[in-house]
């Protein structure tokens, strides 16, 4: 049988090959995670490997018998599991229960001791579906293009969660038979893929999923029943329901904006009287894809940038900078706006048009646009600024539509809650400087960590809270933004690189 030799770090192994499958397809089949933000269409450049010493894109090369393939190191870095902790108290049950946050980029698991109500173990990993695309749209497309697409995506994520649960059980010397339930929260697409339910209806209007998990779906993992958080709509999932429940906003008087920003920006505005909600397609820029030197929040990624006469940065893992993750990208863009390197229209200016203190960092591309060099290896292009511009305009426009639906202004918001890993690392002043988020007093802006995991944890500890979760989802009124003139107008206005308060 024909095979290739694969090297990743200190691991060396062989996998079978044939005359038709790309290297990316072979690696997927072998369970080797390799980023493919564009879904394997040769556009993102994130699946670059070495084949017989030559740099190649795994999605574009069909390896031959005997080839040697060197893969980049597996992604390292910290995955957010910190969250709003439910009060630890005896539940009256024995055994254990698990909460799972099924994110598009990461997967986090918490195992709870039901006797004490305390966390017994926690595990996390980068979502194995990244090999099929960085965002839910590319994964939906994969299921439509490939006859076995749905089973492949469902199988790989179920295997990953099962592996994480097994690790958590092993950490506490427990057996699978002690697991009473698994509560899972994710966006609607991720929950459908996990359950093995077709996501094709979400590829076109009216974007109605086969189920919103408001009725029980029969499913088990390691012999324990799986409970899915109910979703608000096709693109506002159980992760938002979980977050609204865990943050207390579902029971709080006032008008609060809840944001979970990633490749799919989900948001809700309201309080105990109900919510209006929507989703915007941010694209993968916030996750580091579609950006020349972009990367996920892994070792080597610049996560924070500051300028006080000189540039300073935080690098995940503490080593040399190799790229920009979403929070670092926004910090850098905000600095360049303030320093006159990016103008209001989003143009990255060439050296001769910027203040003298910035000129040493700039070169020109073949079209005469500026290229900003943060380090020798990390730089920002005009195309990168454009990718960020589209993503941040989508978020700002979604917020404006929700405000208009509620008939209130930014000043009348009682608070803004930022959920998820991106919300933890995002500098709100940077997001405000580029016109992505409103500028609010510090006391009204709250970063609440992995609220999806917190909501799932509440139901893992107390199964009766499922009724509260269902009520929360049913009290969310979904606004479909596609085709709306007010969203299109707000999106156009949001393209400028200036604070929201000036528009």
Language-model regions, residue ranges each:
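Acidic, glycine/GT-rich loop-and beta-edge segments that sit at the periphery of enzyme/chaperone cores
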Residues: 4-5, 74, 78-83, 223-242, ...
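Local cysteine-cluster metal-coordination motifs and their immediate loop/turn environment
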Residues: 33-64
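Catalytic phosphate/nucleotide-handling subdomain of diverse soluble enzymes
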Residues: 271-273, 404, 408-473
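Short beta-strand-loop/turn "lid" adjacent to the catalytic site in phosphate-handling enzymes
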Residues: 174-208, 433-438
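Phosphate/ATP-binding catalytic cores across multiple sugar-kinase/actin-like superfamilies
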Residues: 160-171, 240-243, 389-411
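Glycine-rich phosphate-binding loop of actin/hexokinase-like ATP-binding domains
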Residues: 109, 117-135, 201-216, 242, ...
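Fe-S ferredoxin-like electron-transfer domains
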Residues: 4, 53-102, 107
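A contiguous, well-structured pocket-lining segment that forms one wall/lid of small-molecule binding clefts
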Residues: 337-406
């Amino acid at each position: 049988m024909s095979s290739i030799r694969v090297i990743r770090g200190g691991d060396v192994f062989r996998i079978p090959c044939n005359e038709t499958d790309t290297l990316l397809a072979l690696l997927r089949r072998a369970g080797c995670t390799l980023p493919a933000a564009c879904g394997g269409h040769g556009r993102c450049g994130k699946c670059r490997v070495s084949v017989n010493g030559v740099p190649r894109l795994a999605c574009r090369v069909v390896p031959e018998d005997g080839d040697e393939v060197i893969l980049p190191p597996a992604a390292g870095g910290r995955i957010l599991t910190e969250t709003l902790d439910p009060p630890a108290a005896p539940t009256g049950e024995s055994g254990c229960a698990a909460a799972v946050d099924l994110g598009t980029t990461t997967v986090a698991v918490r195992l709870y001791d039901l006797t004490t109500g305390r966390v017994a173990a926690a595990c996390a990993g980068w979502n194995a579906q990244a090999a099929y695309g960085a965002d839910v749209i590319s994964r939906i497309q994969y299921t439509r293009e490939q006859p076995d697409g749905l089973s492949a995506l469902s199988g790989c994520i179920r295997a990953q969660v099962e592996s994480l649960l097994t690790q958590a059980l092993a950490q506490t010397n427990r057996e699978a038979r002690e697991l009473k339930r698994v509560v899972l929260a994710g966006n609607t697409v991720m929950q459908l893929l996990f359950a093995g339910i077709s996501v094709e209806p979400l590829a076109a209007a009216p974007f109605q999923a086969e189920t919103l998990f408001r009725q029980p779906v029969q499913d088990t993992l390691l012999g324990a029943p799986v409970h899915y958080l109910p979703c608000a709509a096709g693109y506002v999932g159980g992760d938002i329901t979980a977050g609204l429940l865990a943050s207390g906003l579902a029971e709080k008087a006032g008008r609060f904006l809840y944001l979970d920003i990633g490749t799919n920006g989900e948001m809700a505005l309201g309080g105990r009287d109900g919510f209006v909600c929507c989703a915007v397609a941010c694209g993968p820029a916030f996750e580091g894809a579609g950006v020349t030197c972009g990367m996920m929040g892994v070792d080597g990624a610049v996560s924070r940038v500051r300028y006080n006469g000189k540039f300073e940065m935080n690098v995940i893992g503490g080593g040399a900078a190799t790229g920009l993750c979403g929070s670092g990208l926004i910090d850098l863009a905000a600095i360049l706006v303030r320093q006159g390197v990016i103008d209001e229209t989003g143009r990255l200016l060439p050296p001769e048009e910027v203040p003298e203190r910035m000129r040493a960092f700039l070169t020109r591309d073949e079209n005469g646009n500026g290229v900003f060099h943060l380090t020798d290896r990390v730089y920002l292009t005009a195309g990168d600024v454009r990718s960020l511009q589209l993503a941040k305009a989508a978020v700002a426009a979604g917020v404006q539509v929700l405000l208009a639906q509620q008939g209130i202004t930014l000043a009348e918001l009682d608070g803004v809650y930022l959920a998820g890993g991106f919300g933890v690392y995002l500098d709100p002043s940077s997001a405000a400087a580029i016109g992505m988020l409103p500028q609010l007093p510090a006391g009204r802006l709250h970063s609440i960590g992995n609220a999806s995991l917190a909501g799932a944890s509440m139901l893992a500890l107390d199964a009766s809270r499922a009724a509260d979760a269902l009520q929360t989802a049913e009290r969310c009124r979904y606004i479909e933004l596609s085709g709306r003139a007010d969203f299109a107008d707000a999106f156009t206005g949001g393209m400028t690189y200036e604070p929201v308060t000036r528009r």
